[in-house]
Structures are given as C-alpha cells and as structure tokens.
Amino acid sequence: MGDRNNVHTPPVRSAYMQITWLGHSCVLLSGTKKVLIDPFIDGGSVAWTKPDFVAVTHGHADHMGEAVSIKRPTVAITEIAKYLKAKGVPSESMNIGGTIELRGVTFTMTPAMHSGRIEQTGQGYGGGTAAGFVIRMDGVSVYHAGDTGLFSDMKLIGELYHPDVAMLPIGGRFTMGPDEAMMAANFVGAKLVIPIHYNTWDKIEQDPLVFKQAIERTTDIKVKVLMPGEMVEITT
C-alpha cells in the first residue's frame, strides 16, 4: 500500500488565452477553442483563423462581416441569428442579459448603446439591438463592448463578470471616443484594456498611444495597443 502522505498533486494550470486583434473590432480569442468576434476581415484572414465559434455584436456590415461565408456556429441576438440561419449558418440565438455555454465557452450578452440594423447586399433588415459580450474560456474572462457609447451600467458588467480584459471602442463619432472609453475602463475595472474600432476610416481616426498614456498615467489599468494581426497572451 502506497504512502498516503506522498500522493502526487498535479501542477495547477494558470488560466491562459491568446487574443489577436485583426483590425477594426475583429478579435480572435484562442484557447482550448477559438472564438472570432465581429469577423470584418478578408477571406484570406478567415482561412487561417479556423474558429470554433463566431460572435456577432450587431448587424452593421463592419461587424457582421464574413459571418455568412464563414458558416461556423455563430452566437448573436435573436434577430441576427434568425437571419443567419436563413443563410445556412448554424446559429445560437440569445438576448441581452442571457448566458449560454457551448463546449466549454461561456457567452454572456451585455447591453450596448448603438443601432443594430442588418446591412447586407445593399438592403437593410431589422437586426434587433446592438450588444456586447463577456466571453469566458479557460479561466479568462473577456469583455468585448461592441459598438457603444458610454453608459453607467458598465459598472455592473465589471461587478458581475469581473473581466480580465476589456476591448473598448475609441474611434468616436459612431461610438465612444478616448475620453469616454477611459471612463468606461474605470467602470469595468479590467486590468488590461485593448482599444478597438479606430483608424479604419478618417472619420474614426484616433491616436491609441495618447489613450494609453492618459489611462496609465492616472490609473493602475494597463493598455495594450496592438497592430492588426498582433497577439497578446493573457495569464491570470
């Protein structure tokens, strides 16, 4: 009979995720599964991402992107999920405040202050309301705000879901600008912020380094400015 005081204890695995920014609001989360958020990317980029799931925050063309052509299981608000199913895309419908779990990945749909009409092939369809997501995988919690203005219930998102990383739009005009995003970062309370939705077009031109300096000068929050295609590793 073995020594009961000499039982082997397996090493504790740290939570781990890779986050790759693919430009605009498109982000790839890589862990035991791959989640592609707002797939506004070209076909070549789609080919190498090989996502297990796609998440769409709202119906605008710069967020719905290639969701139809990718045809991977897609998480979206009910109206968008219905539209995608009609296009042959396997879809999981949900709504604001709801949570679903798919093969070890948890999706919670959060509010966003933005419009959400589906824009495809020159026509518009009712796309429900815009949303954000808190996505939890492999012990890491990520908040993708989608397109949104600042709203005070971002504090609740922080209190309820404790995201490790917040991806916040900073482009202004159609979403928050840098000043509002700085306040949003404080509301959410994530230790790391990744700016998104900027510099795609002149109308949303911003300097992300100014945003980074402003936050890091006045808070303990870190900001990671990524180049398109660049990846950051998250451990907790």
Task: Report each predicted region and the residues it spans.
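Core dinuclear metal-dependent hydrolase active-site scaffold
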Residues: 2-49, 93-159, 228-236
